[in-house]
Amino acid sequence: MKSKVIGWNINQRSGMGKGIPKFVIDELIDQNADIIVLTELFQHSTIGYFWAEMERAGYQYAVTQNDGTNEVGILWKKDVYTFRAVDDSVVTTMKNNHPNFLLVDLEDQNGQLLTVVGFRIRMVDYSQRAEELEIVVNKGNEKKNPVLMVADCNNLRRETTETSWNLQVVDRILSKGGFERHTPGGQSIFEEKADRGYAYEFAEDHLITRDIAVELGDYDREFVRRDRIAYPWGKDFQTYDKEHSRRVSVEPGFPDHAIVKGYLSTEKDQKK
């Protein structure tokens, strides 16, 4: 079976926003994905409404318990997948060097087990980001079945000169576990198009797989049409303010990453 998956950093920024905007719920429901991974989620006082709306739309969910910092949420259609297990043992605190990380085991209608991982590499020193990804890969290696990871890697621009953290370092660490990165063209943050071309594109949101085939979609910024006030620059989440000689971004609480998405099938499906 083919499943649609989406990942979205919704920019709750450890509670700096005022809760999840209603249009985010509308967008998630209209995307009609079988699996949803959300990063920079926060357990705001209004989070109960969000979960209730997603449950009404046919989803079940699991969420980290990082207590006061960024969370990861994984949602799945309950008529497509059966929940088997959750691993929320990697807890993020302000004093440790753990990624935002959540893992769930799901079983599809054919009895195929699928492990889904949502993670976000934090904005720490570059060498520490590599260490966080090592934690992710080690957890993924505990599983022998197909694995899907949906990630915000905070990996800098495509051709950064930073040697301790870049896409090549990401790929090298992922390869230790047999994982493959799938990244759309273009940028997932900042402006829709990089001013100086491919080398300066910030493509930080990815699908990562093992024993899964992926039909990758484009980075999706179409949700900006739902709130023109929150997104005054259209599909650009950031712009340069010439009057004050500074860059300005959308307000915290409103997503400032494009949606990453794709369609998945396991190797077992491909052999049928």
Place the predicted regions along the sequence by residue.
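Catalytic metal-binding/acid-base residues of hydrolase active sites
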Residues: 9-11, 41-42, 120-122, 153-156, ...
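Structural recognition of the beta-strand scaffold that forms the well-ordered cores
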Residues: 7, 35-39, 73-74, 115-118, ...
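His/acidic metal-ligating clusters that form di-metal
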Residues: 103-105, 112-115, 129-162
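Surface-exposed cleft-lining segments at the edges of enzyme active sites
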Residues: 88-94, 117-129, 157-158
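N-terminal, active-site-proximal structural segment of metallo-dependent hydrolase catalytic domains
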Residues: 1-56, 69-71, 256-258, 263-272
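Structured beta-strand-rich core segments of catalytic domains in phosphoester-bond hydrolases
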Residues: 35, 39-114
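Active-site-proximal beta-strand elements of phosphoester/diester hydrolases
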Residues: 2-14, 84-87, 103, 112-123
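Metal-dependent phosphoester-hydrolase catalytic domains
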Residues: 86-87, 141-148, 155-272
